[in-house]
């Protein structure tokens, strides 16, 4: 029996009709759906309610119903377990969602027949060190960003790669992105577009004060060190635009490739460049 985690974005599937139809399909095909306990109660399937950790760790695969933001959140939570994700779009066209809701059930039929592939996406790991002690760590599928607040002055951030000094960025912040994240915030800040399955790390200053400060692409084996080089009352580190932590003068952030990957289920012969053209036309 397949155990399948169903994770809806309740802001996009407000009445949970899509979620309920997925659960019914899974039950009809002899599978056991795993649901958040609150969601399970709302649709009358309390016995299928599970704790979050059990959903991510024990499911054979996950169905994420939402948009790119939903996928980013699910990716971080299930990465330690390597659980594959079928990303279903319930909103605007995204870079991460594999299918639309109208394609969901034919896609599930393909998965149950073994007609799918797994695409591995590189992730990042960040560690914040304060007074020589690690205080928090993050993982990200898209990017790790250091940014200033709305009313604070420019940040001064020293960047090193493998202890080799790169530059001191006087800027609104710095983005460290994966290839998956190269089409997100990094692209808006002038960074390069990188094919999503290539493994590199992209460093992009945000609105730098000096014209020569440009994006740098480094090896996935490199370790990036960012040092907060000046007092600034309002600096934050954020991961995938969803988690945040306040950082201060003399804090040090180490960023490297994570040992964990996001495993995306692919059921279509989709073309990244077709998707890229569609998204850039939207912009």
Swiss-Prot record:
Localisation per UniProt entry: Cytoplasm
Keywords noted in UniProt: ATP-binding, Cytoplasm, Kinase, NAD, NADP, Nucleotide-binding, Transferase
Catalytic reactions on record: NAD(+) + ATP = ADP + NADP(+) + H(+)
Chief location of this protein within or outside the cell: cytoplasm
One GO CC term, this protein: cytoplasm
EC annotation from Swiss-Prot or TrEMBL: 2.7.1.23
Record bears the keyword Transferase: yes
Cofactor: a divalent metal cation
A Pfam match: NAD_kinase_C
Binding site for NAD(+): 68-69, 142-143, 153, 172, 183-188, 242
Enzyme class, UniProt record, top EC level: transferase
Gene Ontology annotations of biological process type: NAD metabolic process; NADP biosynthetic process
SUPFAM superfamilies: NAD kinase/diacylglycerol kinase-like
Active site: 68 (proton acceptor)
GO molecular function: ATP binding; metal ion binding; NAD binding; NAD+ kinase activity
InterPro entries: ATP-NAD_kinase_N, ATP-NAD_kinase_PpnK-typ_C, NAD/diacylglycerol_kinase_sf, NADK
Protein role: Involved in the regulation of the intracellular balance of NAD and NADP, and is a key enzyme in the biosynthesis of NADP. Catalyzes specifically the phosphorylation on 2'-hydroxyl of the adenosine moiety of NAD to yield NADP.
Family: Belongs to the NAD kinase family.
HAMAP family given in the database record: NAD_kinase (MF_00361)
Identification of the protein by name: NAD kinase
Source organism of the structure: Caldanaerobacter subterraneus subsp. tengcongensis (strain DSM 15242 / JCM 11007 / NBRC 100824 / MB4)
